[in-house]
Amino acid sequence: MGQPVRVAEKISPSSPGTIRFETNRPLTGMGHCYYHGAEDALSDEDPADVLASRLFARGGIDYLHVHGNVATVDLSKGYTSEGIVDIIAGLFAHYEI
């Protein structure tokens, strides 16, 4: 159970490999969060840090920026965004039935 998160994936027309994921839930407060790797995610409780840990564990990500309800991902060359929507959508799920 938990709050279901709806996610809209928007590919940048001007920057190939950059994808915005807009959610119906806030991921941060007023601040911006920048991640170059999983080591930048310091908290096990902060939603943005948890998301960063999960996305970098998935692989294929060079950079992540999270602000408000938007996560912007720069994909590594040769990788697709497959599976990222599911990771974000499951962020606030504590268990599945």
What are the residue ranges of the model-derived segments?
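Charge-rich, low-aromatic oligomerization/scaffolding segments with amphipathic character
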Residues: 80-92
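Short, surface-exposed beta-strand-loop junctions and turns on beta-sheet-rich folds
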Residues: 27-28, 79-81
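Short, charged/polar N-terminal "headpieces" of proteins
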Residues: 1-17
